[in-house]
Amino acid sequence: VTTVLCRPENGFALDPDAIPDDADLVVIGNPTNPTGVLHPADLLRGLRRRGRLVVVDEAFMDAVPGETGSLARERFKGLVVVRSLTKHWSIPGIRAGYIVGDRTQVRWLADRQTPWSVSAPAIAATIACTSRTATPEARDRAATLARWRDFLQGGLRGRGIDYAPSAAPFVLARLGRGAHAALRERGVAVRRADTFPGLDSTWVRIAVRPPGMTNQFFTALDAVRLLQPTS
């Protein structure tokens, strides 16, 4: 297994040349966790090769207004898209998702699916979240998240804090060493990012929340004097 790192100096963009030519399976999140970077659809299509399966995890694509860059509507041999219902609808305990792709590939995977792999509550949630009435609600949620995300990123930018421009319901920011613990002491929880390959303890992942909650985060951040990125 080869882990391909997306570097901050390149805006966490994927370098397709970094993927080994002989890789028969390539898995990538789009938007990627924890950077929130939305990789161009053409770049992901270009990863296909004879004898290779490309799996694109679009668990956070619902947060992108209009789902720009999604490959879920395309059917290419050698390409499978994984989608989740638990992120956008805030139902993590349901554990429901689905795949889309070439009919032959989907049938091959279905034949190997574990019996009773989806619970009755998960089935009910899936039906509800994919219904016609859910579609406008999903669009509204994406638009609202975009406004909240802009507010968060604007506050980070105004404070001179380095962050990765995000298309996801979170933002990766470089608050400095000790920020995670210092914020927690003030009642604010952010996700430590040093558990992700290629990142250190200066980075944290911040959830996109309503402006009122985001202002509480900024108040705590200002109080701990972590206003500039540190190495």
What name fits each language-model region?
Residues 150-174, 194-201:
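Conserved small-domain helix->loop->beta segment predominantly found in fold-type I
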Residues 7-62, 228:
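Active-site phosphate-binding strand-loop segment of PLP-dependent enzymes
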Residues 42-50, 70-75, 108:
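Catalytic-core regions built around general acid/base machinery
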Residues 185-186, 196-231:
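PLP-dependent enzyme catalytic core of the Aspartate aminotransferase-like
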Residues 78-157, 161-164:
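PLP-dependent aminotransferase class I/II
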Residues 52, 78-79, 188:
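Short, conserved active-site loop motifs that form the nucleotide-linked donor/cofactor pocket
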